[in-house]
């Protein structure tokens, strides 16, 4: 019997989710019968050997992006013992990173459903709310008040997500937000989803910084290019670190 490679990887415990499996395959880290395979949809036999070069640290590559923030701004930036909020949790890369950094509680919210890796979903430190539009999030929507919030969202501007995050965050709380220029410059400036013009990328980044400072009263603690580019098109993205 044959089945898709990404499905087989999850069933064999080689990946925590199909999203993670697909990323590993497309990055050339998976071998089938000794040969590197680049198509997650490839049909393989049940008896076919599948090897992953190096087990990933997080359930998705998003975790490596947030890890870049901890590497750059820690120990001032810390999740240890904190109640945290992950807006746009998706597969759970940021959530996984927070838990591995000692978060006492992570509240994961996402507009989608059934995306979060099972290994995270069963963690007792996790509270999950799916089918939830964070644009309209209020303090009463959460079981606790977070002191650290992180966000990696797509197909929406941070100008619509940062205000509700600020409103639910504890006074003095911190935010790590991934600025994705491809969703800030307008479709006409990102043909095929890729922002090729560095000037537009910088303008998008700086526009979010001005908005957060001037409209939301947030204090910028750090700004740096993400160590990992956007998955689909290789877009340059930016990590931003804030205090309320």
Kindly label every feature range from the protein language model.
Residues 107-156, 160:
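S-adenosyl-L-methionine
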């Amino acid at each position: 019997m044959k089945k898709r490679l990404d499905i087989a990887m999850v069933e064999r415990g080689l990946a925590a989710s199909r999203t993670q499996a697909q990323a590993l395959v497309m990055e050339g880290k998976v071998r089938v019968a000794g040969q590197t395979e680049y198509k997650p949809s490839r049909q393989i036999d049940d008896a076919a050997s599948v090897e992953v070069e190096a087990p990933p640290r997080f359930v998705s590559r998003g975790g490596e992006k947030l890890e870049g923030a901890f590497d750059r701004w820690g120990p001032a930036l810390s999740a240890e013992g904190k109640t945290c909020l992950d807006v746009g949790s998706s597969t759970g890369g940021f959530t996984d990173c927070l838990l591995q950094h000692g978060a006492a509680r992570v509240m994961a919210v996402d507009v989608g459903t059934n995306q979060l890796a099972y290994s995270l979903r069963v963690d007792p430190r996790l509270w999950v709310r799916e089918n939830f539009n964070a644009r309209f999030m209020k303090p009463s929507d959460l079981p606790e008040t977070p002191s650290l919030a992180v966000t990696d969202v797509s197909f929406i501007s941070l100008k619509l997500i940062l205000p509700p995050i600020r409103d639910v965050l504890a006074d003095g709380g911190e935010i790590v937000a991934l600025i994705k220029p491809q969703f800030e410059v307008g479709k006409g400036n990102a043909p095929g989803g890729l922002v090729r013009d560095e000037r537009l990328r910088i303008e998008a980044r700086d526009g979010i910084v001005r908005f957060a400072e001037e409209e939301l009263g947030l204090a910028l603690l750090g700004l740096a290019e993400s160590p990992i580019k956007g998955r689909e098109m290789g877009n340059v993205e930016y990590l931003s670190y804030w205090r309320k």
